[in-house]
């Protein structure tokens, strides 16, 4: 007799999260496909949309098989195809490349945290597809001259071992130059914040509710503050920093998306940012860098909490699957 292998809590968590994320992406790409004019970028958008659509089909098959209620996610009511262009085509290319970067983290975790072979296969296939789209988007950005390369530093000719405690010095005493690892983290934190700054500025123009517009504007200000902070650290050592994307935003007040979708995307991006900052904090070996990452982490966590309160207040937040509350059962 074959015993049915139930989904583990980790598998449920990653499937549930990925379902809502793919649902949001599928709806957003309907608008992008509608307004996309660049014939070189269009195939990448189509391939990304196909990935989201295929994933949603597989999610529903898994949930039906397990007799598990699928999340609501997002529907056609969350997109306004007649809305005018909000961002340039090149901005959407950068956005999709960044989204695939986030997929690499999410799907690799889904793969490594899954036990059942069918769930592992699903995340493996989604990861492979995301890698291909990421590569294609990056190659096209390079061709179009909009990919900003990380800074170059001299290639090391010898291997040195750290022998002095001042390697960790940051506030007092003579500071050592930034390591390649620290430059990498600073550079990509600036790049992600530059994209987020433009995204939030655009959303602050078109969101319907005042509290959502104000939340977007505040997020744009936080992103700009973080950009200036990280850029100043690089520029202090004559290392170039990436530029902002604000010039890619169009002048419109008509939103292509519901406030619910806007808040979901910004909340998800903020959560990802907290994860990136945590990784940067762990890799920072100069004390001043660690202190700065703690500050920006606090900014992001508090901002994310405020965003969560807005989504709860407006009944936009679906509750993730939860464990049984045995204490409540006993009291009942």
Q: Where in the sequence are the language-model features?
A:
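Acidic/His metal-coordination segments adjacent to aromatic residues that form catalytic metal sites
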Residues: 1-13, 72-96, 159-185, 244-267, ...
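An N-terminus-focused feature that recognizes amino-terminal "leader" regions
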Residues: 1-5, 10-13, 27, 34-91
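Alpha-helical scaffold segments that form or flank carboxylate-/histidine-based iron centers
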Residues: 10-15, 39-51, 92, 117-131, ...
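Acidic/histidine-rich alpha-helical segments that form the ligand environment
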Residues: 13-33, 83-122, 177-205, 254-295
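Generic structural signal for well-ordered, non-transmembrane alpha-helical segments
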Residues: 23, 46-53, 57, 98-101, ...
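Hydrophobic, ordered structural segments
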Residues: 35, 95-157
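Conserved alpha-helical segments that form or flank metal/cofactor-binding pockets of metalloenzymes
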Residues: 39-73, 131-149, 211-214, 218-242, ...
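Acidic, low-complexity, intrinsically disordered peripheral segments
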Residues: 311-332
């Amino acid at each position: 007799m074959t015993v049915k292998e139930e989904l583990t809590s980790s598998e449920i968590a990653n499937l549930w999260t990925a379902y809502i994320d793919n649902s949001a992406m599928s709806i957003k790409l309907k608008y992008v496909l509608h307004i996309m004019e660049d014939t070189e970028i269009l195939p990448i958008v189509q391939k990304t949309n196909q990935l989201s659509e295929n994933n949603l089909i597989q999610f529903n098959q898994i949930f039906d098989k397990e007799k598990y209620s699928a999340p609501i996610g997002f529907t056609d009511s969350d997109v306004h195809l007649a809305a005018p262009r909000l961002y340039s085509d090149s901005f959407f290319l950068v956005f999709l490349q960044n989204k695939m970067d986030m997929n690499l983290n999410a799907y690799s975790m889904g793969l490594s945290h899954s036990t059942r072979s069918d769930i592992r296969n699903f995340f493996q296939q989604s990861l492979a597809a995301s890698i291909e789209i990421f590569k294609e988007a990056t190659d096209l950005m390079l061709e179009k001259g909009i990919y900003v390369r990380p800074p170059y530093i001299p290639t090391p000719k010898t291997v040195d071992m750290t022998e002095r405690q001042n390697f960790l010095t940051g506030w007092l005493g003579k500071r050592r130059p930034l390591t390649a690892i620290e430059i990498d983290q600073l550079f990509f934190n600036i790049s992600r914040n530059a994209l987020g700054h433009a995204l939030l500025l655009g959303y602050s123009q078109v969101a319907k509710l005042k509290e959502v517009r104000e939340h977007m504007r505040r997020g744009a200000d936080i992103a700009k503050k973080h950009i200036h902070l990280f850029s100043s650290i690089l520029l202090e050592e004559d290392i170039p920093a990436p530029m902002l994307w604000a010039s890619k935003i169009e002048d419109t007040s008509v939103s292509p998306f519901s406030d619910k979708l806007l808040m979901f995307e910004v909340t998800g991006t903020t959560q990802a940012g907290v994860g990136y900052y945590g990784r940067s904090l762990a890799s920072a070996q100069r004390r001043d860098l660690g202190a700065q990452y703690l500050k920006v982490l606090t900014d992001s966590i508090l901002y994310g909490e405020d965003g969560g309160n807005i989504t709860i207040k407006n009944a936009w937040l679906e509750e993730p699957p939860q464990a049984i509350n045995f204490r409540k059962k006993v009291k009942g």
